[in-house]
Each structure stands twice: as structure tokens, then as C-alpha cells.
A protein has these predicted regions:
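Short amphipathic alpha-helical interface segments
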Residues: 123-166
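Short acidic/histidine-centered micro-motifs embedded in hydrophobic/aromatic stretches
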Residues: 100-101, 139, 184
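Short amphipathic alpha-helical interaction segments
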Residues: 92, 165-212
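Non-catalytic, well-ordered alpha-helical scaffold segments
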Residues: 92, 96-99, 115, 119-122, ...
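Eukaryotic partner-binding/assembly regions in large regulatory complexes
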Residues: 15-123
């Protein structure tokens, strides 16, 4: 499980202001910000915040731990991608996804699929809008959730109300969003047509393939 697993909310990343004042956090934040000519106070605060949060989520609570954590170049690159993703879209859902990906890069074996997916995810996140995330959320829900509790109409309706409807409001239908996701290798167009009923049957066989 990752840093946010099972909490239902964001972790509180500091008990006192000195976390944001850490010399290592300041150095990593400044290194990122120095790439840009115009930096607002708001952006400075956002980058210091997400930098401190990134170290906290991988279990680094002292500067010696932080220095050791960013020794590998790959981790430094991942941290910069976390900063870039959050700077582009300083939203709670982007924060949660970026921190989970950073955690996976640091703690999962380099040869694991989870590690490699996290590396690629952080690279494309700065280019994803809220609409892109809505599309991906619904795709992942229906293709991979395979919720074993959906055994009748009542439980499925509860599932839809809880997990699907929050994404439906303003759901993007414009083709460019889907083309962009394909270009960024977040999705891939299939050569054959797959009916929605088939996806539901594969994901929730107890409900949509029941023959009792």
C-alpha cells in the first residue's frame, strides 16, 4: 500500500512549519524554480509544499534521510516531475496521484511494472487536464475494478452512485481528449469495436453474466 492508501483523505504533511523550512526541501524547491524566469510567491509556496509532501510520503522526516533519498538521479528526476505536475495543476487529486507515483518509484523494485508505470505516469501528468482524469477514472473503473460486491441491481446502483456519478458531471465527449490520451500512451485505440455491455460482463460477471 502507498502513502495515501486506506486513509480516505490527504495525510497531514507537517506538525510544524520547520518541515517547509528544511534546507534540503528549500534546495530542491529552488533548483526546480530556478528553471523559470518568472516565479510568483504563490508558485514558490506550492513547490515548497509539494516538495515537503513528497519527502514525507516516502518516510523522510529528517534532512539526512532526505539527502540520502535523492542521491539516485532517477529519484531527483521523479521529484522534479512531481513538482512540475503539481505546478501545472495544484489540485488535490493531482497531489494524491503524484505522491503515490513518487512513492512507487522510490520503494518498488526498478524492474517491477509498478515502478515503470509510475515513472511514465509522472512524465505525462503535467499535460493532463481534469477532463483527461475523468476519462481515465471511468475507464479504469469499468475495465479493472471487478467489484465482487456487485451481485444485484441494488448493490450495482450503490456502486454507480458512489464511484461513477461523481465523474459524469461535465464528462468530456470531445474526440481531441481521447486522441491526446492515445498520443501520450495513456490509452490505446483498438482496431475492433468493443460493446459497453461486453465490458460490463467481463468486469462484473456475477451481475451481468448471471444465468441463475
Amino acid at each position: 500500500p502507498g502513502p495515501l492508501a486506506g486513509t480516505g483523505k490527504r495525510n497531514s504533511i507537517w506538525n510544524a512549519d520547520e518541515v517547509e523550512e528544511s534546507p534540503v526541501v528549500k534546495q530542491c524547491a529552488s533548483h526546480f524554480l530556478n528553471q523559470f524566469g518568472l516565479v510568483t510567491p504563490e508558485l514558490q509556496h506550492q513547490i515548497r509544499y509539494i516538495t515537503a509532501a513528497a519527502f514525507h510520503c516516502i518516510g523522510c522526516d529528517s534532512d539526512s534521510d532526505r539527502k540520502q533519498a535523492v542521491t539516485p538521479v532517477l529519484v531527483q528526476e521523479a521529484l522534479q516531475n512531481v513538482q512540475k505536475a503539481y505546478a501545472a495543476h495544484p489540485d488535490t487529486h493531482v497531489e494524491a496521484l503524484a505522491l503515490q507515483a513518487f512513492y512507487d518509484i522510490v520503494h518498488c523494485p526498478a524492474v517491477s511494472t509498478r515502478h515503470l508505470v509510475a515513472v511514465d505516469a509522472l512524465k505525462v501528468m503535467p499535460y493532463l487536464s481534469r477532463e483527461h482524469y475523468k476519462i481515465l477514472a471511468v475507464l479504469l473503473l469499468f475495465l479493472y475494478s471487478r467489484n465482487a460486491h456487485n451481485v444485484d441491481k441494488e448493490t450495482f446502483c450503490q456502486y454507480i452512485d458512489t464511484y461513477v456519478l461523481p465523474f459524469v458531471d461535465g464528462f468530456p465527449t470531445e474526440r481531441p481528449y481521447y486522441q491526446q490520451l492515445d498520443y501520450l500512451h495513456c490509452t490505446a485505440f483498438e482496431g475492433k469495436e468493443t460493446h459497453f455491455a461486453e465490458i460490463l460482463a467481463d468486469s462484473y460477471p456475477l451481475l451481468f453474466r448471471y444465468r441463475g
